[in-house]
Amino acid sequence: MSVSQELFDRARRVMPGGVNSPVRAFNSVGGTPPFIAAAKGPYLTDVDGREYVDLVCSWGPALIGHAHPVVTEAVHEAVERGLGFGATTRGETELAELVVDRVAPLEEIRMVSTGTEATMTALRLARGYTGRDLVVKFAGCYHGHVDSLLSEAGSGLATLALPGSAGVTEATAAQTLVLPYNDVAALEAAFAEHPGRIAAVITEAAPCNMGVVTPQDGFNAAIRRITQADGALMILDEVLTGFRVHEAGYWGLSNAAGESWAPDLFTFGKVIGGGLPTAALGGRREVMEYLAPTGPVYQAGTLSGNPVAMAAGLATLKCADAVAYQTIDRRSEQLRAGLREALDAAGVDYSIQEVGSLFSLAFGTRSTGVHDYADAKGQEAFRYTPFFHAMLDAGVYLPPSVFEAWFLSAAHDDSAMDRILSALPAAARAAAEAQPPQP
């Protein structure tokens, strides 16, 4: 028995499913998840001594690679000063200044500890600011495990084939309108049906939790136009894309491409904490000033702005310069080219969905692509399991769900890329040979 198997057996006796986040249990791909002992640069090492090239990157935060010396030094220095004070520190202001400086529409931000807290607070703030009750979300977009946003939420719910979550009351769900993604007409119809009642539309900047889905040209701009006309807020969830696809997040990528829209509120997470639990919401000063202590919308957190997490986030973002993003983009393009070559040679039907350096693989979608949650759920997901395990056996760690994005870092060098690319042909053949499950 492997050490990972032994630890997984122990974990299942004391934790639901043996994990603290469902996707880690490997339910959708099967097998025993490797228990990770250490990580450095682009590599993970498990408790059995196996090394993997990492294409999960802690679900995004490891932008410049694991255990980057600048980040670890900053964290060590912060730890020596104390783990937390329950009081305001210099690091909070410095990280806030850096984020506000990078993302032009931001005027103020509030640090929290998780992306879920950020989106939960953004919804409360939108309702408090507008005095309205309804919220619009899009099917397949994931905004954390906020009760009112779990309907058709993609990510873990899609992995587990669940439409929503038990424990969410009908009254809570009734305050959320769920619309098809990339459907401007549906959004216009919702506002026509509920004039003056919608507090906000929340959307992933570019969905990455039903696989990666590209917003159709003008979709985010249409959300901005429609919300503004009705007096509702637009909340752009950049928990995953923020500082991952561009130094100013997806908004920065879009702005660089010539788009001129901007939301009222942003949410950030993952990269902003450099691997430690940190997230934030931010936006226009007029809206943000509704948060306590300056306004009537309450939000608080004992560990919000934790000094060690601030140090990790600040060091990571300072290292994430133009060269780092260029490297990640180049490596992502190289991997996508190798993936296409291997899958084409194996005769597999597929499409690759991409936004900046982020991408995902969807089997059986060459003719249609993936434009919304219905498309994502219609893919030949059964082909991903043998593909995943062939890569894992070859020492490449992929997301253990077909509904998640692939991540690279600035630390993925030629050696790491060679290992990934050499593993792809056998994995592609395994996917080609896969058979659909029997009814």
UniProtKB/Swiss-Prot annotation:
The keyword Cytoplasm applies. Pathway: Porphyrin-containing compound metabolism; protoporphyrin-IX biosynthesis; 5-aminolevulinate from L-glutamyl-tRNA(Glu): step 2/2. SUPFAM superfamilies: PLP-dependent transferases. The keyword DNA-binding does not apply. It catalyses: (S)-4-amino-5-oxopentanoate = 5-aminolevulinate. It comes from Kocuria rhizophila (strain ATCC 9341 / DSM 348 / NBRC 103217 / DC2201). The lineage of its organism: Bacteria, Bacillati, Actinomycetota, Actinomycetes, Micrococcales. GO terms for cellular component: cytoplasm. Its cofactor is pyridoxal 5'-phosphate. One of its GO terms (molecular function) is transaminase activity. It is found in: Cytoplasm. This is Glutamate-1-semialdehyde 2,1-aminomutase. One of its GO terms (biological process) is protoporphyrinogen IX biosynthetic process. Homodimer.
